[in-house]
């Protein structure tokens, strides 16, 4: 049954329903357990995504992929995520979110379990796309779920997902390479992570209450909230400008994440373990999305994002033009990770949802997923081709240092007056 009508009603303030919602507000333990399980599912999602990158040299050697093919497989799964974005947005606005979440986790877990069975480029690409589609649907549904429940702290709520993603990004390469070494096969981690995804489905089905996942923004006792200053259409000047910035973010982050381990191992001659640590350090930077989200609830998000992208440009220049020492690589991999995955991902996502009315947040989240991951889908291939033509240093300059400046230009079109604030900004 469509849930559009209740959400439309919330747009006007929801005064009548607000007091009832307060009296039936779930116990703190129920909320903590429910959102803890949802966060754990996103940790598994991130681990599932990140394990491919440090194992790419072994996968290429085993299956005979070129660098360009490997780069496309490393980030090409995000094409499935991009394809999921818009339909996921409509589903989230119309179908119970808990059902969408469970189905999406099942899809990406099956895709992960099928990956070790690949015998060539075509079937592995198909399995990666299936995983990506499920992960894209989950990303849209999960961001709307937490942002709607914690509406006045939307950026911090989405930042908590970024922290979960960062934890998974940190653990994925380390756990994945450890499992691969222990079992003597790059296939073993995919089996382990796929089974973990199936297990979390059961835990969410039992431990997450429906009133946590189906909350409507602005309907839980917040009658004072007004939305008439927001655009009537979900695809408006702000969301389109933010989509351009988001696409730049996807090209930068996934291009970097997909081939940075290969750069460390082939150009700087790092061991597999050292490259895995460097990749995990990026995840530590992502975990700072809690701080970036907290800031996003309190300051002008356009200004915050501008500073973020300038930081990404500076850190990428230092990363690929500085010394090959481990401490240098680790420090600036962390800075780039916290700028792009910590701040840009969190604040572009929340700013998009704040630029639409409550019954349209699913479509805003879907647009974010589509724009971010459609760019991410080609990022590894583009970066690999630039490396083949220009070498690592100049390829990094154009893709990792110039593109954040494109995002800065797009942000000039964002109207801060048509973004819903938390009430803490002026």
Language-model segments: residues:
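Juxtamembrane intracellular "pre-TM" segments in multi-pass secondary transporters
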Residues: 18-27, 212-241, 426
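Extracytoplasmic gate region of multi-pass secondary transporters
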Residues: 52-53, 237-287
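Helix-breaking motifs and short loop linkers at transmembrane-helix boundaries and internal kinks
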Residues: 64, 96, 117-123, 151, ...
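Conserved MFS/SLC helix-loop-helix module at the cytosolic interface between two early adjacent transmembrane helices
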Residues: 83-119, 298-299
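Cytoplasmic helix-loop-helix junction between adjacent transmembrane helices
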Residues: 127-166
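Helix-loop-helix hairpin linking two adjacent transmembrane segments in secondary transporters
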Residues: 161-209
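C-terminal transmembrane helical hairpin of 12-TM major facilitator-type secondary transporters
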Residues: 302-348
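A late C-terminal transmembrane helix in Major Facilitator Superfamily
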Residues: 353-390
